Amino acid sequence: MYEYKFDVRVGSKIINCRAFTLKEYLELITAKNNGSVEVIVKKLIKDCTNAKDLNRQESELLLIHLWAHSLGEVNHENSWKCTCGTEIPTHINLLHTQIDAPEDLWYTLGDIKIKFRYPKIFDDKNIAHMIVSCIETIHANGESIPVEDLNEKELEDLYSIITESDIVAIKDMLLKPTVYLAVPIKCPECGKTHAHVIRGLKEFFELL
């Protein structure tokens, strides 16, 4: 059976991919409609690519490229409504999708600094677990300690000083980078120009 194969660049990584099949596409649509996309998306990335150790935003970008190549919808047709009421046909090149630039993930708690990593795709379904699993190292008193070297009591002491407001701030920091696509639009009626931005996997799925 013929397989359409292609490469996708995600940051510094070159990922080998194959287009997903009609059966896999229909499974994705069904999962989207019944709210169970996590299992299917992870399966598509596993079965259709050789990607390893991607974070959330990298996996989202890979999925969008996989979708665009597989369905032949590199140029997706959509419409945008101008403030003057005009419906404007809009051509969206999904391969122009980008991800926000990564940042150094440091968070300060009193005299302690915590180094985080970005979460994996769908880790954000449980925020508390996501935050705990993304801790890499603790910096205190001039020492840098990998989280796996902390004993149970030390971990409990660390978790006990993380307040509700800290949880919100850390969550926002970890989930800030996402996929986005800016589409320049000019209204043929009123002449107004606008950059329509599609942001986050949820908004991209609305194009399906």
Swiss-Prot record:
The keyword Disulfide bond does not apply. The lineage of its organism: Viruses, Duplodnaviria, Heunggongvirae, Uroviricota, Caudoviricetes. Transmembrane segments: none annotated. Keywords: Late protein, Viral release from host cell, Viral tail assembly, Virion. It is found in: Virion. Its main location: virion. Residues 1-5 form a propeptide. The keyword Glycoprotein does not apply. One of its GO terms (biological process) is viral tail assembly. Baseplate hub assembly chaperone involved in the tail assembly. This is Baseplate hub assembly protein gp26. GO terms for cellular component: virion component. It comes from Enterobacteria phage T4.
